Regions:
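Conserved active-site and cofactor/substrate-binding residues in soluble primary-metabolism enzymes
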Residues: 6-9, 38, 162
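Alpha/beta-hydrolase fold nucleophile elbow
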Residues: 22-32
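Short, hydrophobic alpha-helical segments
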Residues: 18-19, 171-176
Length: 176
């Protein structure tokens, strides 16, 4: 089943593959929600020598606190003895291993090891991940850019073009 640690391992394999390509230039990491957590922790593990810059969109560092609380996206469970899986929206299921690994995930501790340029974009109207989780990334990454978008939701549904523009401008500036 999917866990954050095995998604980080997958991200490292993708990085290794990209770096093996003869035409590969500098590598950036970007991710939305849980993908932002994975991008931040992978960048922390690989370091600024390997990852030129990072962009996080509504990074879901809340997932650890959710697991500790026993409430992930509205699905409730005993955090000390999670079931085999919990039912999420639609037909989505979250497995026991995900909850158990999320419970003690060193999200900010690992991400903090990254010292390169970073950009965090988060909305004040995010009902899934409070924007304070994005602010905390800004606090652990001195010199990072923080864009707090007023009333923007978790999917940036009304601000998509603005998010794309901020992301592209940042990547163009930092991947030269």
């Amino acid at each position: 089943g999917m866990t954050v640690p095995n998604e980080i391992e997958d991200a490292k394999l993708v990085y290794e593959y990209v770096k093996s390509l003869p035409f590969a230039g500098p590598v950036a990491m970007t991710g939305h929600s849980q993908g932002g957590v994975i991008a931040s922790m992978t960048a922390g593990d690989l370091g600024a020598d390997n990852i030129k810059c990072v962009v996080l969109l509504a990074p879901a560092a809340v997932l650890r606190d959710d697991a500790i609380r026993g409430n992930t996206m509205g699905a409730r469970y005993n955090p000390l003895d999670p079931p085999e899986y919990v039912q999420l929206f639609g037909d989505k299921k979250l497995g026991r291993e995900y909850i158990k690994t999320a419970f003690s995930l060193p999200i900010y501790e690992t991400a903090q090891k990254y010292t390169g340029p970073a950009c965090i974009i988060h909305g004040t109207g995010d009902q899934v991940v409070p924007y304070t989780y994005g602010e905390r990334y800004h606090n652990i990454w001195p010199g990072s850019e923080l864009h707090i978008l007023h009333a923007a939701d978790h999917m940036f549904s009304k601000e998509m073009q603005k998010v794309v523009d901020i992301t592209v401008d940042f990547l163009v500036k930092n991947l030269k």
